[in-house]
């Protein structure tokens, strides 16, 4: 969007400011507490999700967010902007993995609770899902066209398992000493052949 000279403001939520990284690209972004999912072994823990979130603060942030000067809201399943757009009757486009589950072939397999989360956690007037298999209204995960100047290595592997049990992930990867793993997980620390990736650091 910045490439096309569109005025863009960014709002981040769901993770503590101290846990954010590589945020310089977003300039003076806004932060809200938002809502986040508690997970256990790769699955949503519904009880702890309900317990750890402040819904009073969430609705306060939603109602206080002034969208009167904005023409369009883009959300990547971020609930504060999505709900603020709905209340303000502003067009909102949802882009992300979660929106792929609105496709009938996937939606029909969800439980009622899962359907509720997909429909109402971060509602959008239009949506574009991301999915690695071809589906209507979905695109594959976005990959930068411009590659890093770092030489490509077949032994440098990107691992995206942010909701899995970190100890199990580490135990599975550490023995593979001939590979370097960049692991997307909120609690990962640099150790042996594992590191935490960042926007510009993975070839």
Describe the function of each predicted region.
Residues 3-10, 68, 177-182:
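A generic structural motif
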Residues 40-72, 77-80:
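Conserved nucleotide-sugar donor-binding subdomain of glycosyltransferases
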Residues 165-183:
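Short hydrophobic signal-anchor/transmembrane segments that target glycosyltransferases
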Residues 102-166, 183-202:
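A nucleotide-sugar donor-handling region in carbohydrate enzymes
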Residues 88-91, 124-125, 177-179:
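A short helix->loop->beta-strand "cap" motif at the edges of active sites that frequently abuts
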Residues 3-57:
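Conserved nucleotide-sugar phosphate-binding/catalytic loop shared by glycosyltransferases and other
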Residues 86-103:
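Active-site proximal beta-strand in glycosyltransferases
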